[in-house]
Structure formats: C-alpha cells, structure tokens
Amino acid sequence: MMIEYKNHKIFAFSDTHGLNYRLKIPKDADILICAGDCADEIDRFNCVDTILSRFFDWFSRQSAKVKIFVPGNHDVLFDLNPKLAIKLVPSSIVLLEDSGFEFDGISFFGAVCRPWMFTNAENKVPKGVDFLITHGPAPGHLDNNKGCKRLGEIIEESKPKFHLSGHIHELGGQSEATETTT
C-alpha cells in the first residue's frame, strides 16, 4: 500500500513469509514499512535466523531513504532469542518494538502486538503519532473478528493519523475510520 504524506511516498507491506523477492516496491517510495511476518510458516522454528538474515539483506538493499521493521508472530526469533534477532538487523533498518522514530517531521511508533502478546506499549504510544505500526490488527478493521480489543482502545486514546497492521492475510487492504486510516 502506498501512502503519500508530508511530501513523502510511504510503501507499507507485511506477511511476505519468505517471498519478499516477489514484492514490487515502487521505485519512488522513499519510506518503507514492514509490519512483520517476513519468516515462512514452514521454517519458522527451524532456520528462522537464516530467513530473517535473508529478508534483512534484501530489505536493506532497497533504495528507500528509510526502512522500518516491526516483527510479526512468525518472526519468532524476536521472542525466543531477542538478542540474536536484534543483532541480525542492519543499522540501515529501523527496528521498532514498543519504540518510536521520527524522520523529516513524520513520527512512527511500532508496538508489539502479536496474537499471543501485547506488551505495555499502551503506556508509550504518543498521542497524535503519525504512524502506529503493529503486526496484529485492531477490531473492526480488516481483522476477521480477531482484532486485539486493547489495541482498539489504544488507537482511540492515542489517535494516530494512520494505523498499519497485517496478520489477517485474506483481508489485506485498507480501511478508513474517521480521521484514522488502518
């Protein structure tokens, strides 16, 4: 999905599951956001460090000025061995896990929101952040009735301009609610 915002072209994607090389990234995108699940279902417990390394190598070679990554539920190394997972992320990629980042007047916040865990990000999400990025969706927005209720409350409280998520493959797309796009 391409978003034009504050004179930047932002391309967001998720759930490539090892098939990132098939993704057609627009050449004019200057900010890339991956909302998780770059690892493949079959290999998620076996060679996940190799899969993550391949993804990060591919992601870092993209021509965008900024590349942001928020892990998903298949990127299990971030849960099982976070120190190793963090070492795999090149310095050219911004890893957001319950943390924020700003670029050229655009604020981003990545919250850990995977199906089995939602951390204490609610204490950290800044009000009015431009982009809230989670892997899991909020309820009522492309979620197949599986959205995280607490995430929905956090979105109501923090009022991000955009909420980017993935996880529910069959409902990929874009929806709008009031002033927030999810």
Where do the PLM segments sit?
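Pre-active-site segment of Zn-dependent metallo-hydrolases
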Residues: 18-24, 51-54, 115-125, 141-150
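Active-site-proximal beta-strand elements of phosphoester/diester hydrolases
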Residues: 7-17, 105-114, 130-135, 181-182
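Conserved beta-sheet core of the metallophosphoesterase superfamily
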Residues: 65-68, 140-182
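Short acidic-hydrophobic surface loop/beta-edge motif
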Residues: 1-4, 97-105, 174-179
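Core catalytic region of metal-dependent phosphoesterases/phosphodiesterases
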Residues: 13, 18-103
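Active-site-proximal segments of metal-dependent phosphoesterases and phosphodiesterases across multiple
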Residues: 39, 44-49, 127-161
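Catalytic metal-binding/acid-base residues of hydrolase active sites
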Residues: 17, 38-39, 73-76, 112-114, ...
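Hydrophobic/aromatic beta-strand patches that form the interior of the parallel beta-sheet core
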Residues: 11, 33, 68, 96, ...
